[in-house]
Amino acid sequence: MEDSTEDIIKSFTLEQSPEIKPKPKSKTSDLTDIVYAMDDDSIKMKKFTIFDDKYDQNVSDSEHDLTPIKRKRQQQPPPPQQPSKFSSSIPQKPTLSPKKLASSPTKNYTDHINQLRSGPNSPKKYQEDENVRSLKYEIKRLKQEQNLKLENLQNKIEYLTKERDELQDQLTSMSFENDKLAKKNRSLSHENNHLTLENSKLKTKEYSNEDLQLEKNKLQRMNNTLRSERDELVKDFNLTRDKLKKYYDLYLHCQKNHVNVKSQRTEVGGDKPTADNISTNEELVDILRKLSEMMIDQNKMSEPIAAIEKDKPSEDKTSSPNFDSSKDAPRIVSEFLEEFIKRIVEEMSANSKSAPSSKQHINSEMYSQPNNFSNNTMPPSQSAAYIPSNSQPAPRPAAAAAANIYSSSTPNTNGYNQSSHSNDRPNTFELPRVERDHWTDRPPSERSTQSTKYMKMDPEEIRKLVVIITDQLKKEENNEKSSNTLDSETPIEKCQCCHGNPRNVNEPTNQKLCQSCLNKGDFTMSEFMGHSN
């Protein structure tokens, strides 16, 4: 029997389960490997359940009770009671149980069976040992199964850890990309703000363009008004020139009517200078014609500049138009001619009421100094020494007063050096001799105030006018000298009185004009007005 049980146990010995190698993990792996391993373990467990069913039907596959089997003990019947009726009368001996010996069987059969079963070679003891062995095998199997499951779980944990690390790496990379996108978003927001600012600037620039357009229109209107004013000034200049021509015709008419008066003219300290009346008149006409032509040329020079400014694009006309000094020349000359005509009328009316003056006084005192009349506003071509006729001597204090008036200490501001050009000026004509009013004999309230009027003029305007006239005269003189060969039989007398320069009035040599200056035919404005009457 022992051999048979050992054969049975050997047939059901627990084989060592082969080691399960974990499959390589991948991102797509799942729990299928663990499920397959559990199925293999369940197949192996069926062998042990069959072995348990053979030897113990009370043990199930899922329940393994390691406690020993409890058996019911047979209760021995209590010893029979002796009848008590004999106790009082007859004493009884105590019952002695037989001595139990190992070799000798007991009288009770059940006890004997129990004794046999509890022995080391009893079948029950052998069965209990087999159960213990089976339990040990079961424990070993469960431990192996547990170790396998733990290994699978460990592999799964490692796989999940690796997956977690990969996800962590992806998370860090995504966080890095997120930071880059955040930076890009900030840069785009900054660029958006910049574009918004540029848009607002463009809107404001549109408004500023409208303002500039309005300003441009305003400047164009101003330019048109200035052009219209310039046209009016040119028109006034033409009218003034026509008036001057009329007054000059009147002067010629008066000169023809007073031809007989010219024969009565005498010269102090010499003979009567000879001069052709027709040539001198033509010379004055030429001077006035040259002056008018020069003004017309300046007007023509200013017109192309205005045309160029008109042809310029409107964008360049943002600033106010500027007129150069050449455009101001017609205005300056026009104002001067207007004042010149007014002065002609006033002095003609004043000279009509004049009385004869002293000849000696005029010759000796009045022309002892260069004429500073009107604060040097008249050009040198219109200043000359004049010797009136029918003059009578005047008292000395009046002559001294006249000398003080004409010997002004005001410097020469017209920019013209009379001494340097005294020998180059051509001989001017001789005017008819008429009676002249000596205005110094009148009280100051009745004297003419043209000099103070011209003293109020701007010296710059006077200088411009004088320079223009003198330059034109010098050009004409040079042309005449080069074209016409004049007879120079009589030598030209040089100026000995320092005409046109500041002098000391107290010097006796500077009290009179030299013969050269007298022969030039220079005359003052007052004398010219007196002859034109």
Curated annotation (Swiss-Prot):
Statement: the UniProt record of this protein carries the keyword Cytoplasm: yes
Residue spans of biased composition, Low complexity class: 83-94
Region (Disordered) location: 1-32, 53-130, 309-329, 349-453
Subcellular location: Cytoplasm, Cytoskeleton, Microtubule organizing center, Spindle pole body
Domain of life (superkingdom): Eukaryota
The entry's keywords: Coiled coil, Cytoplasm, Cytoskeleton
Biased composition (Polar residues): 103-121, 349-392, 405-421
Basic and acidic residues bias locations: 18-30, 53-68, 309-318, 432-445
Gene Ontology annotations for the cellular component aspect, listed alphabetically: cytoplasm; mitotic spindle pole body
GO term, biological process aspect, one: mitotic spindle pole body organization
Coiled coil start-end: 136-236
Record keyword Transmembrane helix present: no
Summary of the function given for this chain in its UniProt record: Plays a role in mitotic spindle pole body organization, possibly at the point of spindle pole body separation. Required for mitotic exit.
Protein name as annotated: Spindle pole body protein CSA6
